Amino acid sequence: MGKIEATSKEEKLRVQKEAEARRRAYRDLKKEARQMQKEVKFDTDDNSELPKKRFYRQRAHSNPFSDHRLEYPRSPDTMDWSKFYPQYYDSESKKMTSEVEIADIGCGYGGLLINLAPEFPDKLLLGMEIRVQVTQYVEDRIIALRNQYRNELQNNYQNISVLRGNAMKFLPNFFHKAQLSKMFFCFPDPHFKQRKHKARIITNTLLAEYAYVLKEGGIIYTITDVEDLHNWMVKHLEEHPMFERLSKEWEKQDKCVSIMWNSTEEGKKVTRNKGSKWVACFKRLPTPDDCE
């Protein structure tokens, strides 16, 4: 009996190792292709297949306070956006022709980015994600879509990109004051334990930074399937002097609310499980004269 159990455990371990080896080989292949795509324009005849999510396994959440050895610019002026949006880079002036205007904080597998891209063809959208494998998946997904739609004049996904970053620590390193018009916080980590609430993506301290990078009239979009987290985010945003909640009527008419309702992987899962979703949107108010 003992030998049978030992053999079963060894077989299970062997299968797990083989599966991990296949995932690693797949990711290495995509990484090599990703590096090649960054060096060339998308004018070849090959068809890039969309990446397979099962090869990019990752924990559901990541500790934002950990040292993730992230690369980030010293200031927005030193950030090189050309490799993220090559079609928006003017090689003669060596400057970008447009700035990032819409940010998806904790973009997950990129569903919202990809659905928003055709709605804002003249604006640059950026997804920020802290998890390594998930970021690589979104990057591979965008590269594949750019290849598939390279002959389209519009809706060719050149206006979206993703970077691995920690928005809770380094957001002002990437964006100038009043640069963004929209920020999305879709199904963030709820951090249920009270001692973990400081790690939530909406806090008084972080709202000051969001107010800094948002332009006057800019919108913060939030959606979650956790009512307690929804109440937490609403409470902190309503208490902050630089934000004002938008009405339910406004939410019903806004196309971004409709898109984010069911475009993310988490949102689709909640729908499949017939769960509830809570939405709240807030407008960035003008800065008082005595604060400028």
UniProtKB/Swiss-Prot annotation:
It is found in: Nucleus. Its main location: nucleus. Keywords: Methyltransferase, Nucleus, RNA-binding, S-adenosyl-L-methionine, Transferase, tRNA processing, tRNA-binding. Forms a complex with TRM82. Belongs to the class I-like SAM-binding methyltransferase superfamily. TrmB family. NCBIfam families: tRNA (guanosine(46)-N7)-methyltransferase TrmB. This is tRNA (guanine-N(7)-)-methyltransferase. It comes from Debaryomyces hansenii (strain ATCC 36239 / CBS 767 / BCRC 21394 / JCM 1990 / NBRC 0083 / IGC 2968). The lineage of its organism: Eukaryota, Fungi, Dikarya, Ascomycota, Saccharomycotina.
